[in-house]
Amino acid sequence: MNKLVEDCMRLGFGMMRLPRIEGTNDIDLEHTKRMVDAFIEAGGKYFDTAFIYEGSEEATKATLCDRYPRESYYLADKLNASDFAAKNEKEAKNEINISLERTRAGYLDFYLLHGIDEGNHDKFDSYGIWDYMKQLKSEGVIRHYGFSFHSTPEHLEQLLTDHPDVEFVQLQINYADWEDTLICSRRCYEIATRHGKPVIVMEPVKGGKLANPPQAVKDILQRANPDASFASWAVRYAASLPWKQM
C-alpha cells in the first residue's frame, strides 16, 4: 500500500458527534477543545469534518485550526452533491470555498466525495466533480482526494475501475458489519485493496453501538480480557486491517 501519510497514528478524530451544551443543540466548544487537546497530546493528527455536518466546520476552526499550527495536523473535509446540499453544479463546486472559509484551514489534506451511493452517483458525474477534484489538487487547494462510500460491492468495483486516479476510499468497517449482507464491509474492503487503494475506516464502533454490545458479545470479550473496554475491542478490530490507513 502507498501510504498517504507516514507520521500519523492509526486513529483519527471525527468532528461529527460532538458534545452539546445541555438543553441546547449548540456544540460545547470548551468540551471539544479538551477532547482535541487530549487527542493531539496522545499523538493524534488526523481530523475529519464535512460540509453537511451542522456546526462541525466552525467547531473545527474554533477548537483546532485557530489553536494549532497548520502543519501539525491533517484535515479531511467532504463535498456533498446530493440535492439537500447542492441544487446545481455551481453550488456543489462552491462547497470547497465555504468549507475553507468556515475552517480557515487554508487547504485540505484530504477531500472526499461524500457518501457515494447509487442514488447520488449521477450527480457527481454530471457535475464533473471527479475532474474538479483533480483540478483542486493541481492548484494545491487539496493534497489528496477520495470518496466515502455507502453502496454495494459491485458499485465500488465500478467506481474504482472508472476512476483509477482516486487515492483512497473511506468505508464503514467494524466487526458487526464485516459479514453483514447489506453493508458488506469485508467484500468492499477486499475490492479496495485489490485496486491498491488505502482504506480510511468510518464507524469502527458503529456509532457507539459496539461500546455497549449485546450481552452475549460482552461475555465473550470479558472472558478474553476483562480489563479491556468494549469500545477498545472495536477499534482494535478495525485497526488490525493491513490496508487500513486511518
Which residues does each predicted region cover?
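N-terminal binding-site loop/beta-alpha segment at the start of enzyme catalytic domains
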Residues: 1-73, 132, 138
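Conserved, mostly hydrophobic/aromatic
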Residues: 13, 39, 47, 60, ...
